[in-house]
């Protein structure tokens, strides 16, 4: 049965941190748009950890879905060069806390303190690409790769973090996802269609920054960003221009004067040829001609570290069935509870659940709300089917419900199915 641990409330940068007494010595180490990160000591394991508080995860359905996606990804992606989830818990105030290993610093801070020697540039790039090979093999795009999302410890072990923006490899995507300096041109040009190659572009920008100690494309805004990219790469080729979906973007690009590319050997005169060659293969306008993470690992520049027997791929593709579902907050909430339960059941953390009376009340309330949403959605579906003279199965699979955008009632199917699943999962807490 679940263990009961005492929750302790404290203030960090004016933000309430409510964590179990298992974790002590809180110190702030980072702040993002969606959460505050503190270092702490795990008294049970006797080691330092990082604790990320997700701000108001259930305030909107969008934030609830984002938190659910990040949790699912952290559970699924297990690799030496990715941050590892060690524990997760829900506080009485309904805040979500992710506990991971503590890395000490990030690449952004490191680049601000000193220039990197060649062997460190090679080793860090190798680890980034090794992690990306695994991520991409799981059918996942990181979408927000940048120096501050690359964590490094005193042994120079590197881990990619912050998968909150990660998405499925899907032909239809949203545009504004990554920090501007590291944003691939296809995101700016099409805003809709892109794939894993966007991470390779970001890694190439980071590679250049490690070499030179400053960002390669420090755009002041969207237009300036595209302009300085073309200063180096020249005008985008016609086959890339033909993929632009936005009429306004197409008009803007075609109105620009033609620019010839600058040879990379000329732009990076003091850099060794192998490094320049790999960089040039990563920073290509046409994403389909950009080198893959797997191919980059076998490039001569990374020969000192390349080991084909120790560069694994994912055992299974990540399940994105939930990603197109437009569900109520209460349904996302109970689905989140089920993921927390599953994490501890399969041996995450210490294999036990931290729970209390307030938590039990949260589960009960959310279960009732999710059940109501499921019942209402199923009733609406049946009413619509009767009025249209159709008699289809209202318990359409979640996969079909979330991906069949052509059906007018597909989201009601999704709510009904996920709501019923949420009730089933939540009942497990009460056993």
Curated annotation (Swiss-Prot):
Entry GO MF terms: ATP binding; MAP kinase activity; protein serine kinase activity
Keywords: Activator, ATP-binding, Cytoplasm, Kinase, Nucleotide-binding, Nucleus, Phosphoprotein, Serine/threonine-protein kinase, Transcription, Transcription regulation, Transferase
Keyword Hydrolase in record: no
Keyword set includes Transcription regulation: yes
Catalytic reaction annotation: L-seryl-[protein] + ATP = O-phospho-L-seryl-[protein] + ADP + H(+); L-threonyl-[protein] + ATP = O-phospho-L-threonyl-[protein] + ADP + H(+)
Cell compartments where the protein resides: Cytoplasm; Nucleus
Cofactor requirements of the protein: Mg(2+)
Activity regulation: Activated by tyrosine and threonine phosphorylation.
Protein name: Mitogen-activated protein kinase HOG1
Residue span of motif TXY: 174-176
Matching InterPro entries: Kinase-like_dom_sf (IPR011009), MAP_kinase (IPR050117), MAP_kinase_CS (IPR003527), MAPK_p38-like (IPR008352), MAPK_Sty1/Hog1 (IPR038783), Prot_kinase_dom (IPR000719), Protein_kinase_ATP_BS (IPR017441), Ser/Thr_kinase_AS (IPR008271)
Residue intervals of the Protein kinase domain: 23-302
Record region (Disordered): 374-415
Main localization category: cytoplasm
Domain notes from UniProt: The TXY motif contains the threonine and tyrosine residues whose phosphorylation activates the MAP kinases.
């Amino acid at each position: 049965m679940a263990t009961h641990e005492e929750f302790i409330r404290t203030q960090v940068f004016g933000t309430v941190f409510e964590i179990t007494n298992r974790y002590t010595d809180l110190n702030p180490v980072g702040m993002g748009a969606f959460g505050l990160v503190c270092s702490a000591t795990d008294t049970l394991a006797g080691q330092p950890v990082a604790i990320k508080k997700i701000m108001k995860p259930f305030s909107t359905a969008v934030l609830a879905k984002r938190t659910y996606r990040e949790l699912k990804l952290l559970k699924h992606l297990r690799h030496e060069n990715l941050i590892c989830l060690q524990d997760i818990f829900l506080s009485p105030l309904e805040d979500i806390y992710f506990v991971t290993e503590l890395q000490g610093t990030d690449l952004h801070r490191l680049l601000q303190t000193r220039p990197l020697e060649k062997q460190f540039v090679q080793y860090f790039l190798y680890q980034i690409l090794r992690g990306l090979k695994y991520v991409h093999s799981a059918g996942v795009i990181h979408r927000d790769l940048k120096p501050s999302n690359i964590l490094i410890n005193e042994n120079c072990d590197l881990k990619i973090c912050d998968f909150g923006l990660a998405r499925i490899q899907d032909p239809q995507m949203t545009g504004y996802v990554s920090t501007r300096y590291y944003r691939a041109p296809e995101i700016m040009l099409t805003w809709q269609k892109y794939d894993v190659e966007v991470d390779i572009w970001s890694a190439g920008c980071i590679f250049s920054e490690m070499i030179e100690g400053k960002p390669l494309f420090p755009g002041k805004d969207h237009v300036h960003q595209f302009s300085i990219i073309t200063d180096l790469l020249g005008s985008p080729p016609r086959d890339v221009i033909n993929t632009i979906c936005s009429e306004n973007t197409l008009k803007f690009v075609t109105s620009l004067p033609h620019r010839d590319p600058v040879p990379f050997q000329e732009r990076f005169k003091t850099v060794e040829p192998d490094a320049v060659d790999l960089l040039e293969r990563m920073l290509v306008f046409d994403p389909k001609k950009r080198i893959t993470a797997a191919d980059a690992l076998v490039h001569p520049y990374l020969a000192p570290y390349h080991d084909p027997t120790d560069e694994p791929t994912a055992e299974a593709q990540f399940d994105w069935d939930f990603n197109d579902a437009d569900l109520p907050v209460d349904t996302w909430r109970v689905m989140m509870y089920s993921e927390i339960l599953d994490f501890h059941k399969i041996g995450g953390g210490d294999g036990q659940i931290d729970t209390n009376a307030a938590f039990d009340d949260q589960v009960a309330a959310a279960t009732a709300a999710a059940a109501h949403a499921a019942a209402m959605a199923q009733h609406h579906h049946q009413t619509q089917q009767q009025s249209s003279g159709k008699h289809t199965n209202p318990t359409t699979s979640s996969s079909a419900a979330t991906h069949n955008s052509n059906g007018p009632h597909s989201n009601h199917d999704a709510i009904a199915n996920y709501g019923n699943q949420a009730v089933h999962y939540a009942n497990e807490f009460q056993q």
